[in-house]
């Protein structure tokens, strides 16, 4: 299938639907945002489930008529300090959220885990992030990393664009799930840290991410969950 040019709002809508299919569905909770070339920030509106987001459900954070999520400051806080970030995901996937409720670290057990060879950040306040001060504190905790476990709450994931943010979010949950499964079998045997860092740029390339992004959309279309369908 040839790639089709998509608006930023369409990309955010696709991201929401893909994440819903990949373990991030949680009623109307969870949100994805993206930063446009002009610096404007667009985010899934409040009140709609990830699996049913359409392009017109993606609104500007500056729109005074839009109903925004309470935790929109999670997104604006990161964009304020990370010029490299073009997209942000917040959600409550079960395995990564459960990992964040323990003292265990995510380790590079598989090729999924090597995406986080530089570590996953942590934020130790379980409260909702509803003001600029807390949004800024989360951004500080994230630092230069690509993912953060919000202890007893959920996850925050960033990418330089929407496909990368989605891949990172999906891979974080998969890595946490595989670690949980492996732990049930016995002692964990992670990939050597240096090997993981060397393998990461081989395994995770822009061209691969583009392939995965298009594949996710084809899968959703075949399942009837693509854009333009009926509300879930």
What are these regions (language model features)?
Residues 1-232:
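Glycine-rich flexible loops
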């Amino acid at each position: 299938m040839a790639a089709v040019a998509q608006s930023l709002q369409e990309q955010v809508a696709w991201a929401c639907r893909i994440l819903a299919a990949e373990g991030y569905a949680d009623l109307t909770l969870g949100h994805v945002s993206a930063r446009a070339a002009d610096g404007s920030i667009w985010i899934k509106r409040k009140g709609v489930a990830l699996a049913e987001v359409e392009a017109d459900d993606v609104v500007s954070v500056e729109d005074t008529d839009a109903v925004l999520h309470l935790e929109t400051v999670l997104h604006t806080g990161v964009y304020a300090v990370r010029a490299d970030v073009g997209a942000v995901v917040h959600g409550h996937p079960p395995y990564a959220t459960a990992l964040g409720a323990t003292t265990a670290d995510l380790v590079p057990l598989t090729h999924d885990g090597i995406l986080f060879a530089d570590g996953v950040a942590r934020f130790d306040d379980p409260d909702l992030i509803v003001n600029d001060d807390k949004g800024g504190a989360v951004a500080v905790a994230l630092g230069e990393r690509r993912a953060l476990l919000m202890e007893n709450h959920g996850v925050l994931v960033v990418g330089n664009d929407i496909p990368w943010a989605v891949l990172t979010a999906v891979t974080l949950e998969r890595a946490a799930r595989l670690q949980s499964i492996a732990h049930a079998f016995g002692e964990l045997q992670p990939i050597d840290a240096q090997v993981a860092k060397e393998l990461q740029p081989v395994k995770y390339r822009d061209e691969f991410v583009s392939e995965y992004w298009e594949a996710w959309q084809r899968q959703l279309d075949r399942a009837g969950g693509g854009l333009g369908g009926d509300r879930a």
